Amino acid sequence: MIRILKYGEVANDEIFARTESAINVEGVVSDIIADVRKNGDAALYKYCEKFDGAKLSSLAVTPEEIEEAVAAVEPKFLEILRAAAKNIRTFHERQVRNSFIINNENGIVIGQKVIPVDRAGLYVPGGTAAYPSTVLMDSIPAKIAGCREVVMVTPPGKDGKVNPVILAAAQIAGIDRIFKVGGAQAVAALAYGTESIPRVDKIVGPGNAYVAEAKKQVFGQVSIDMIAGPSEILIVADGKTNPRHAAADLLSQAEHDKMASAVLVTDSEELAVAVQKELEVQIPLLERAEIARTSIDNNGKIIVAPTLSLAIDIANELAPEHLELCVDNPFDYLDSIRHAGSIFMGRNCPEALGDYFAGPNHTLPTSGTAKFSSPLSVDDFVKKTQYTYYTVEALARVAEDVAFFATKEGLTAHAKSATVRLEDDK
């Protein structure tokens, strides 16, 4: 049963405690990466058979396989995927940054170029569930950014095939190439390249502890989006909130995995007790009841705060991945929210809207990193470079100042480089 904690009656350490993974996979992942770097495709085939139970003759998904998969998906779901993709595109198109140039008409031009990364790599998990939503959320921003190529990796089933809904989403998103490989070995292949899989410049997408560790280890060789921790939801709710709705929203994250975190912060002790009871009613009805039960019992909590203002302060300190504001006039509180991955406003905005359909991205910072990190966006798939142009007359006006500055830092060659051109012109 979920715990109820009264703020001020328990230690702050208990209020702000986070789910932490005890699994250490650093050594195993390091060995896998080294194997893929050395043996390329041969290592990937080996790991596909070992971990996925699939004996493959080719890593690449063919156009025929994609068409066959799309034909196998029910038409209603294809319509929903296309509608979701449209919403995601509409939102992310507003994120596009433009290059700029500043010409002060005194012989000086400075500017900034916004340039997409050449090739982006998308990791899509397999395992206990298929996530076509991840395909859309992680690839559409890359396509909008203008990446020359978007490559996807995802583990196959034992039959050597990729889940049809994953391939259907990939076709809708316009992904260029797809490969049947998952786990740390897939991350290694994207980072270093193999005979079949091209090296990418950016790797994005969630995964298990092995995938997260692999992304951590290859960072620097390649850019990554973030190191994702367990899924999180925090609901700030007043006494008018329907406890059935609050419990359902908590369970929407608790069913993800046993390490997921579900937290309710409320100024109503009556709501706290009602939600606690409602969770016990709803959990046995879930298909993933065992996972949700473990998550709620081990990592869930209901915090009773004296005021909604303090509830907001608690939310800011926890900086959750998903934050629901189940209160009257939620926009009155928006300016007070400083740290959250994504905010869901009002009583009619379950977090599931953001997971699938609304348009804002669902790849979000976890484990408190929303204090300094942002959701996945078009920005993740571009880089910026800057440029400077001076005429000889413009240089002459500032060369002595530049030289003086450089000399103060003890870099006389810097100083000379600023003045030598003027000496040549005498």
Regions found by a protein language model. Give the residues of each.
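C-terminal core of ALDH-fold dehydrogenases
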Residues: N316-K426
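N-terminal Rossmann-like NAD(P)+-binding subdomain of aldehyde/semialdehyde dehydrogenases
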Residues: M1-D118
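Flexible, glycine/charged-enriched surface loops at secondary-structure junctions
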Residues: R97-I102, A260-V265, L285-I296, C326-V327, ...
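A conserved active-site cap/scaffold subdomain adjacent to cofactor or substrate pockets
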Residues: M226-N298, I302
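Conserved NAD(P)+-binding/catalytic subdomain of aldehyde/semialdehyde dehydrogenases
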Residues: G174-R244, A248-S252, H256-S261
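Short acidic-hydrophobic, aromatic-tinged amphipathic segments that line or gate anion-handling sites
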Residues: R3-G8, R177-G182, I302-T307
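Conserved small-residue-rich beta-alpha loop and adjacent elements
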Residues: I102-A168
